[in-house]
Amino acid sequence: MQTLQQVENYTALSERASEYLLAVIRSKPDAVICLATGATPLLTYHYLVEKIHQQQVDVSQLTFVKLDEWVDLPLTMPGTCETFLQQHIVQPLGLREDQLISFRSEEINETECERVTNLIARKGGLDLCVLGLGKNGHLGLNEPGENLQPACHISQLDARTQQHEMLKTAGRPVTRGITLGLKDILNAREGLRKTTLETNSLAHRTTW
């Protein structure tokens, strides 16, 4: 089932998305939720954390999965996906280290893909994948092209992606990323894709 909702602005989109995420967490306290990073989901995560604290929702059984990461950057740098999730999800919710399945950007190779894929499988797979749509159409760091990779892989970044806002503090070119593949994303039981445009905001919810 696919549901496409158009709301009046980014704030309304973020509020609606946070309500949906909270409903998933309430219905399945041990849910495995894959999270995108960057500007699009930022306010959603702020609202979600706020609601969890206000309503005293138990998050001790949750597992979050980092969708992607830049390659060859220390995880502690400000522009990494790791730093983003630590600042906006992990620390505000007081999560344990084992509640985040995360790529280690200093150790990137195909073994890292296998490690993360196996950890997700041991948890029973993804219940929900939160996505943003990149300016060039990428999902995660699956760049548009003729040869899309179904599984977790190391990707060569498109020129536009290399200019991503998160990389402005990198201090050096970043040309590769690691990401869950399109099959990994589609294997999630539900998907929540958020798109913000100059004139409107869209939330696209899919149950596979």
Predicted regions and their residues:
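Ligand-binding beta-strand-loop-alpha-helix segment within the catalytic cores
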Residues: 1, 57-130
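N-terminal glycine-/serine-/threonine-rich phosphate-binding loop
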Residues: 1-33, 110
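Glycine-rich N-terminal segment of FAD-binding domains in flavoprotein oxidoreductases
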Residues: 27-53
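Short beta-strand segments
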Residues: 34-38, 66, 103, 130-133, ...
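A glycine-rich beta-strand to alpha-helix segment
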Residues: 36, 40-44, 119-146
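A glycine- and small-aliphatic-rich helix-loop capping segment at beta-alpha/alpha-beta transitions
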Residues: 47-58, 81-83, 144-154
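Class I SAM-dependent methyltransferase SAM-binding "motif I" and its flanking Rossmann-like core
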Residues: 136, 140-182
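ATP/nucleoside-binding phosphotransfer catalytic cores, i.e., glycine-rich phosphate-binding loops
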Residues: 183, 187-208
